[in-house]
Amino acid sequence: MLEIKSISKTFNAGTVNEKKALRGLSLTLNDGDFVTVIGGNGAGKSTLLNAISGVWPVDEGHIIIDGKDVTKLPEYRRAAFLGRVFQDPMNGTAATMGIEENLALALRRGARRTLRIGIRNSERELYRDWLKRLGLGLEDRLTSKVGLLSGGQRQALTLLMATLQRPKLLLLDEHTAALDPKTAKKVLDLTAEIVEEQHLTTLMITHNMKDAIQLGNRLIMMHEGNVIYDVAGEKKKNLTVEDLLHKFEEASGE
């Protein structure tokens, strides 16, 4: 499903501010893999997701999604088959548009543009059904501006929008980090439910090591632009936070 072959990315090359964010990183995800990604600040986690999504083209290597080499594809072309949720609840939605309008845009992502304006009643019923599963009462607020929603409501809506068309790959970049603990748990529970139900291949960055262990079927740790630890199955289930802290200490030489 996802095959990354020796990708490298350097920022400000040849200057005093040169930063090697990715160093020949290789990674393969099978169909339906739910991989949690941990690592310290500057480990290359967000750069990896930005490379996959096309925000930052890689300097070397190849990125293959569902058998197609997308290394040279621009970001807008990859958006047709990728879903992404960012850390900031303000990203991923149009604040001045209504909930139903945001859902309509997500549903039409990648489709040929037409001159037709408006949302059919049959679509509204579909949107209500989708929103009910969030348990946030948004099904009764279809015309409400998204900018008026709370951070948790907006992030849950963004997650729903990112998965409406069952993306080839779902990228979650610390998507609960800006939420309070109660809301974060609700969004994480919803994430696990949607990923399992749709059998989505998923990469989820998190700084919460407990969540990294509990969620998904596989865990990778990054350090200085590469994967230094990759664990799955029963071995992952049996991990403790102390185990991961020890791995961090080993990597940083402490």
Locations of the language-model features?
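H-loop/switch region of ABC-family ATPase nucleotide-binding domains
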Residues: 206-207
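ABC ATPase C-loop
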Residues: 162-163
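Conserved beta-strand-loop-alpha-helix hinge in the C-terminal portion
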Residues: 226-249
